């Protein structure tokens, strides 16, 4: 069993996102091929977005740093550090109002 410093990882990913042409960086904490549970830390530089995409399974989003906007259809929620939301089972997008880091947890099909 290995522990991960999410604070340190968030700082590193945010630095990478600021320097990336896409304005984002991510690291898979758990999951991948053969795992139903997948967790990733995603950093977005302020003003950057993850464009609208499908939700491939049950998913939650926890904001670690910053402030983001989750949009799903007509529903919009703005979340700040320490807040959590269940992502609706529909197409959605994520926009960073400022430099932000989120923890995405997903239970999909194998």
Task: Give the residues covered by each predicted segment.
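Glycine- and acidic-residue-biased ligand/ion/polar-headgroup-sensing regions
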Residues: 57-73
């Amino acid at each position: 069993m290995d522990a991960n410093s999410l604070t340190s990882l968030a700082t590193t990913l945010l630095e990478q996102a600021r320097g990336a042409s896409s304005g984002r960086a991510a690291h898979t904490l758990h999951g991948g091929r053969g795992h139903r549970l997948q967790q990733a830390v995603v950093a977005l530089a302020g003003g950057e977005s993850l464009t609208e995409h499908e939700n491939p399974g049950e998913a939650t989003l926890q904001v670690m740093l910053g402030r983001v906007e989750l949009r799903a259809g007509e529903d919009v929620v703005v979340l700040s550090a320490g807040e959590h939301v269940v992502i609706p089972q529909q197409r959605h997008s994520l926009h960073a109002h400022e430099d932000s880091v989120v923890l995405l947890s997903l239970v999909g099909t194998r």
